[in-house]
Amino acid sequence: MARGAGCSTSTRSPRWHGGGCVQDPAPGVAARRGGARGDRRIRSQHAEHGPGLRLLAGRKDHYAADRAEGDRLLEIYPQLADLVQENRAFIIRAVTMAADLGISQFIDLGAGLPASPAVHQAARKVMPEARVAYVDTAPVVLSHARALLATRDGVTAAEADLRDPAAVLGHPHLRAVIDPARPVCIVLGAVLHFMDADAACAVTAGYVSLLAPGSYLIISCASFDDPELAKQLSAEYTPATWHNHPAEVVESFFGGLELAGPGLTEAQTWRPWLAEPVPCHRDGHVLAGVARLGDA
């Protein structure tokens, strides 16, 4: 694969399974994720903090500027709000699966403003002793998180750049609740489409190299069939540049790790809690998957 088209270390063929649309029946799965910081400095590692996507995510803490940009984004692609919400629902299902499999430590990278259910709520529903670290750079994110988490043991917020895995895993706030020598679930939900392919590969490879065997990697990434549509959305969305990664590139972000079934698929068809997908056709997708680091 040519440099810039994906991770050069990945030799596996794409296993993207297309699918239909589902409505997740689980309560409280309205999305908060819209993306994250990419290859230039922005206010937060999670691009939802730009106007527009915060509103499309169904958040209550949006502002007038959010409504204006949200309207413009919807004019370009009316189904964008569906993608944001489907992404969030996938994250909750994937975290639930990891907790079901015995993972008790979670790191949410580019966490964004708190949502309900949050990662710690989803994990603790299955694993009451789960410990969670939220990582971001935006002061508003950190202040919100610390205020909400002040009375919760085993949950913390750390100010760190997700693109520096060693700094993240060594952050004193994170180390107060997370032991990287034990299996950890890393959540990279809707952040890697704000990086070019090489940068995204470097980020995921960095975490994989530092994680204990038996750890999990959760990735979701927006992708559009029409490159021009992606360019229009990127031009309108001010906090970061969107990179339109096709399925084979998104799969390469896993660095050759074996994906849990059903492999790389659309978010709404990854182990849906509603048995029968409702078929639909659209240009935008959230590609999603979960991989496990093999035992030593």
Residue ranges and their predicted role:
Residues 224-240:
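Short, glycine-/aromatic-enriched active-site segment of Class I SAM-dependent methyltransferases
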Residues 167-168, 194-206:
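A short, conserved alpha-helix within the catalytic core of class I
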Residues 185, 211-221:
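Conserved beta-strand signature within the Rossmann-like core of class I S-adenosyl-L-methionine
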Residues 6, 16-160, 164-177, 208-209, ...:
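Rossmann-like AdoMet
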Residues 271-296:
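Core SAM-dependent methyltransferase catalytic element
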Residues 162-163, 175-199:
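A short SAM/SAH-binding and catalytic strip from SAM-dependent methyltransferases
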Residues 191, 220-223:
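Short strand-turn motif at the edge of the Rossmann-like AdoMet-binding core
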